[in-house]
Amino acid sequence: MEDLALRPKTLDEYIGQERLKQKLRVYLEAAKARKEPLEHLLLFGPPGLGKTTLAHVIAHELGVNLRVTSGPAIEKPGDLAAILANSLEEGDILFIDEIHRLSRQAEEHLYPAMEDFVMDIVIGQGPAARTIRLELPRFALIGATTRPGLITAPLLSRFGIVEHLEYYTPEELAQGVMRDARLLGVRITEEAALEIGRRSRGTMRVAKRLFRRVRDFAQVEGEEVITRERALEALAALGLDELGLEKRDREILEVLILRFGAGPVGLATLATALSEDPGTLEEVHEPYLIRQGLLKRTPRGRVATELAYRHLGYPPPVGPLLEP
């Protein structure tokens, strides 16, 4: 319930994504002026950047209802038909998270719904089977995905608007922390909020989570104001360093450096050495390490950079293998 209370309701309250918000204001005003539903919108970007929150904001700005579901939850066309025919009114928004995980059968039934607001359902089997056409309310579909490359071309072509969410700056993340603190009645200094923002991996969801944990530490210690010093102590207790690396992130780099001489080493070999699932390593940990310049993916395998050596306090080797 606390997260719902903190969720922004308008584009002005939504922090960050300024270029996207500027375009959305145009799209929303145009739709309202024409008294038409918003064009179908696809939002893509890494997890935790606020795609679901943005869908709620758009619905609130338009004054329409929002129906939230996910790709894996729509297993067959009947599931989709039930949502479209029974849960939506004219102008409402259907939000499908992880839309890249829609089944092929459900996706094919979504095409005419998006284009013509109709859906054909087959009733019965064999010679007695018959097709019923459902007339649907004119709705707007907002799809969200962290894997845009898995969106099929036919589905992608049916979105009138395709937008990318970017990582947040530490300053934007600090603004988010300050906003949550204000709404929760928690006193925190701007310096403390910025330290949280710097360790939040460019992700608002992480910033909100870290703020709640820092608040826990301050509350238990009886602190009335979360200062920079208190925030740093709490963040250190959580195992985060100044780049926001967690214990597991540092272990990945240490194994690369100490066991494999910085690499290159294959994903499967590295995962085995860490007793980690290769998918978790590749999708959860590596993107941030790569973005921070601590790790590289090469045709021969993973390589720790000179920056990784310096961050962990190891003297970098001399040679052409590692690049800063």
Swiss-Prot record:
Binding-site residues, ATP = L6, R7, G48, K51, T52, T53, E115, D116, F117, R158, Y168, R205
- Output the Gene Ontology terms for molecular function: ATP binding; ATP hydrolysis activity; four-way junction DNA binding; four-way junction helicase activity
Q: What is its EC number?
A: 3.6.4.-
UniProt-annotated stretches for the region Large ATPase domain (RuvB-L): 1-168
Q: Which residues are noted in the entry as DNA-binding?
A: R297, R302
- Enzyme group, top EC level? hydrolase
Q: Provide the alphabetized UniProt keywords.
A: ATP-binding, Cytoplasm, DNA damage, DNA recombination, DNA repair, DNA-binding, Hydrolase, Nucleotide-binding
Q: How does activity depend on temperature?
A: Optimum temperature for ATPase activity is 70 degrees Celsius.
The protein's location, in the record's own words, is: Cytoplasm
Major site of localization recorded for this protein? cytoplasm
Q: Where is this region: Head domain (RuvB-H)?
A: 242-324
Task: Please give a single GO biological process term from the UniProt record.
Answer: DNA repair
Chain residues that bind Mg(2+) = T52
Task: List the residue ranges of the region (Small ATPAse domain (RuvB-S)).
Answer: 169-239
Q: One GO term of the cellular component aspect? A: cytoplasm
Record-linked InterPro entries? AAA+_ATPase, AAA_lid_4, DNA_helicase_Holl-junc_RuvB, P-loop_NTPase, RuvB-like_N, RuvB_C, WH-like_DNA-bd_sf, WH_DNA-bd_sf
Q: Which reaction does it catalyse?
A: ATP + H2O = ADP + phosphate + H(+)
Reported function? The RuvA-RuvB-RuvC complex processes Holliday junction (HJ) DNA during genetic recombination and DNA repair, while the RuvA-RuvB complex plays an important role in the rescue of blocked DNA replication forks via replication fork reversal (RFR). RuvA specifically binds to HJ cruciform DNA, conferring on it an open structure. The RuvB hexamer acts as an ATP-dependent pump, pulling dsDNA into and through the RuvAB complex. RuvB forms 2 homohexamers on either side of HJ DNA bound by 1 or 2 RuvA tetramers; 4 subunits per hexamer contact DNA at a time. Has Mg(2+)-, DNA-dependent ATPase activity; dsDNA and supercoiled DNA but not ssDNA stimulate activity. Binds to linear dsDNA in the absence of ATP or ATP-gamma-S. This subunit can promote Holliday junction migration alone in vitro. Partially complements an E.coli deletion for UV sensitivity.
* HAMAP family per record: DNA_HJ_migration_RuvB
For this chain, the family text in UniProt reads: Belongs to the RuvB family.
Query: Know anything about its domains from the record?
Result: Has 3 domains, the large (RuvB-L) and small ATPase (RuvB-S) domains and the C-terminal head (RuvB-H) domain. The head domain binds DNA, while the ATPase domains jointly bind ATP, ADP or are empty depending on the state of the subunit in the translocation cycle. During a single DNA translocation step the structure of each domain remains the same, but their relative positions change.
- Which proteins does it associate with, and in what oligomeric form? Homohexamer. Forms an RuvA(8)-RuvB(12)-Holliday junction (HJ) complex. HJ DNA is sandwiched between 2 RuvA tetramers; dsDNA enters through RuvA and exits via RuvB. An RuvB hexamer assembles on each DNA strand where it exits the tetramer. Each RuvB hexamer is contacted by two RuvA subunits (via domain III) on 2 adjacent RuvB subunits; this complex drives branch migration. In the full resolvosome a probable DNA-RuvA(4)-RuvB(12)-RuvC(2) complex forms which resolves the HJ.
Protein name in UniProt: Holliday junction branch migration complex subunit RuvB
